[in-house]
């Protein structure tokens, strides 16, 4: 989601996820060079052939933190369906997929936020129930939020929400997954830089700093018209 013109902004990830069933395709949203490398290598060496769809926004390629060490390419390194963080005293867990991670991480560093963990879902389909389930179970007392840039009726939200809720049921957790992102819209992007940037900042502020009451209040999504 690049926030430019309506048809220049989104790869329509929600449409690919709509087609995903019965392990028919693989849908990835890689956030590191090593993740991209291992995804391609895994595809070559697998003993079966199924379509691999990878989303790679241009702005992610230019981000200074989008790097991987040599060790992440060599030895026993491999593709990780999710990328977790080792953060102590976590009170809030943010789940996201794709380039929004870097904006959230930059905002977290700038504001010295120490209690929020960001978990990246690198493989959206087949959904990583096992690895993500372990994260959910280990943080059962934390606030849990899904963050995306896309409007609420687009992006991965419609696909992931029922699957994350399934994990709550599986582990018998009295939990809810809360949404932070843009409100439902007919077009993927406003096409007006000022509105886009203001909404982008609101998404970061609400997801990382706002109390849970405000997160719940904004559950319909951030409006394109707030600027």
Predicted regions and their residues:
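Generic detector of short, locally flexible boundary/turn motifs and exposed helical patches
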Residues: 17-21, 55-58, 109-113
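Conserved thiamine diphosphate
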Residues: 1-46
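A broad, low-amplitude sensor of folded, mature protein cores
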Residues: 33, 42, 49-60
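Thiamine diphosphate
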Residues: 2-12, 46-49, 61-227
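General beta-strand structural signal in soluble alpha/beta enzymes
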Residues: 27-31, 54-56, 147
């Amino acid at each position: 989601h690049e926030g430019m013109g309506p048809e220049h902004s989104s790869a329509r990830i929600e449409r690919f996820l709509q087609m995903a069933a019965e392990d028919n395709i693989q849908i990835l949203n890689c956030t590191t060079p090593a993740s991209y490398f291992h995804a391609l290598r895994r595809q070559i060496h697998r003993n079966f052939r199924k379509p691999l769809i990878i989303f790679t926004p241009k702005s992610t390629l230019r981000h200074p933190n989008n790097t991987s060490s040599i060790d992440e390419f060599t030895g026993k390194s491999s593709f990780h369906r999710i990328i977790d963080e080792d953060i102590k005293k976590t009170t809030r867990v943010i789940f996201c997929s794709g380039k929004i991670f870097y904006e959230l991480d930059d905002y977290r560093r700038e504001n010295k936020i120490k209690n929020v963990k960001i978990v990246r879902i690198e493989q959206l389909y087949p959904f990583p129930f096992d690895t993500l389930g372990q994260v959910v179970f280990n943080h059962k007392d934390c606030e849990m939020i899904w963050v995306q840039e896309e409007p609420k009726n687009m992006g991965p939200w419609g696909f992931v929400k029922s699957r994350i809720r399934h994990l709550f049921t599986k582990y018998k957790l009295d939990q809810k997954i809360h949404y932070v992102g843009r409100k439902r819209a007919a077009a993927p992007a406003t096409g007006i830089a000022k509105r886009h940037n203001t909404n982008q900042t609101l998404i970061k502020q609400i997801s990382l700093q706002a109390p849970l009451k405000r997160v719940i209040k904004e559950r319909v999504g951030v409006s394109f018209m707030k600027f």
